[in-house]
């Protein structure tokens, strides 16, 4: 490990690896570090991702594909089922990944592009001089290093320390984080062609239960519960999950279990300072509805890698420059989708189970494989006029997209 690089990327998840790969492909000298000894472990997500969006970043490799889904099914509290084709099921439906293999493959791609990759290497602080981030202090195999870099990219996940060290407010309120529990189960009778989502305040307050098939009778079964819906004397997410698994998959065996938090806050005020950018969960770039963040992380990582090249080439790594080449670009793309999802989340978290059932009853006969904006508006208006009014900004934006695509 040298003491000077063009770019130092802290965290080798999808955001960090794509950022490192992109910057290295531009000819920059890049160091990508990961605090754990194995990239991709532990897995902390359902592992679902949209096919076409994924193909923008990588060639599909069967080694890290567990399942190829046709679509998704959403179940309301009374069991009403809404079936949607894969194309309109959102960013988490399409392929189910083997994240341990996938994340390592992304890091390998970064290394192939020319980045130096170091595992079991932890950042312990930033080097800040004259209000500019100049690098970081690292710990590797018990030895301390000072590594300087023209740009630091913080991709250290939901527990990010890099942002806090840089003076960026990434604090999450209870309403801004979902506490999650997930089991990998085996030996269960599971539909291997569709992922399933279960909603309801009795089942998952302020969140949902997910079932993502992984082939061979295996599936990721998990739950996310909004922090504001939890309390000292209320059941824990794992208690809700145990109840669901016992009822839905009584013969299943638990093979793995993971626990963690997912940011669902929407965009934070800033994600860059002099000499530093945040990406992925560290920048709170996950979807506020689903908590899914793989694709957003990869999109933002690519933008950050490109921004690092532009800023370094211009000899200007100031926050003003980084806002121009990174902040504005991700907010106009990834950030726009996050903002729209936040509107929906804030409307739906206050719905009762009766409201959710009413919506499901109105939507169950809609042909989602060819659903138009008008179809959805009519169904929502029939089910809940107040909800439609609360979502008016979202539909106004969607209508603009329809008009733009037709011109």
Swiss-Prot record:
Gene Ontology terms: biological process: glycerophospholipid biosynthetic process; membrane lipid biosynthetic process
Name under which the protein is recorded: Digeranylgeranylglycerophospholipid reductase
Keywords, comma-separated and alphabetical: FAD, Flavoprotein, Lipid biosynthesis, Lipid metabolism, Oxidoreductase, Phospholipid biosynthesis, Phospholipid metabolism
SUPFAM superfamilies linked to this entry: FAD/NAD(P)-binding domain
PANTHER family in alphabetical order: DIGERANYLGERANYLGLYCEROPHOSPHOLIPID REDUCTASE (PTHR42685:SF18), GERANYLGERANYL DIPHOSPHATE REDUCTASE (PTHR42685)
Keyword NADP: no
Catalytic activity of the protein: a 2,3-bis-O-phytanyl-sn-glycerol 1-phospholipid + 8 oxidized 2[4Fe-4S]-[ferredoxin] = a 2,3-bis-O-(geranylgeranyl)-sn-glycerol 1-phospholipid + 8 reduced 2[4Fe-4S]-[ferredoxin] + 16 H(+); 2,3-bis-O-(phytanyl)-sn-glycerol 1-phosphate + 8 oxidized 2[4Fe-4S]-[ferredoxin] = 2,3-bis-O-(geranylgeranyl)-sn-glycerol 1-phosphate + 8 reduced 2[4Fe-4S]-[ferredoxin] + 16 H(+); a 2,3-bis-O-phytanyl-sn-glycerol 1-phospholipid + 8 A = a 2,3-bis-O-(geranylgeranyl)-sn-glycerol 1-phospholipid + 8 AH2; CDP-2,3-bis-O-(geranylgeranyl)-sn-glycerol + 8 AH2 = CDP-2,3-bis-O-(phytanyl)-sn-glycerol + 8 A
GO molecular function: flavin adenine dinucleotide binding; geranylgeranyl reductase activity; oxidoreductase activity, acting on the CH-CH group of donors, iron-sulfur protein as acceptor; oxidoreductase activity, acting on the CH-CH group of donors, NAD or NADP as acceptor
Enzyme class of the recorded protein, top EC level: oxidoreductase
Annotated GO CC locations: membrane
Other known facts: Reduction reaction proceeds via syn addition of hydrogen for double bonds.
Pathway assigned to this chain's UniProt record: Membrane lipid metabolism; glycerophospholipid metabolism
Cofactor, free-text remark: Binds 1 FAD per subunit.
Record's function text: Is involved in the reduction of 2,3-digeranylgeranylglycerophospholipids (unsaturated archaeols) into 2,3-diphytanylglycerophospholipids (saturated archaeols) in the biosynthesis of archaeal membrane lipids. Catalyzes the formation of archaetidic acid (2,3-di-O-phytanyl-sn-glyceryl phosphate) from 2,3-di-O-geranylgeranylglyceryl phosphate (DGGGP) via the hydrogenation of each double bond of the isoprenoid chains.
InterPro entries linked: DGGGPL_reductase (IPR023590), FAD/NAD-bd_sf (IPR036188), Geranylgeranyl_Rdtase_fam (IPR011777), Geranylgeranyl_reductase (IPR050407), GGR_cat (IPR054715)
Binding site for FAD: 15, 34, 45-46, 48, 99, 123, 281, 293-294
Gene3D superfamilies, per database record: D-Amino Acid Oxidase, subunit A, domain 2 (3.30.9.10), FAD/NAD(P)-binding domain (3.50.50.60)
Cofactor(s) for this UniProt protein: FAD
Membership in a protein family: Belongs to the geranylgeranyl reductase family. DGGGPL reductase subfamily.
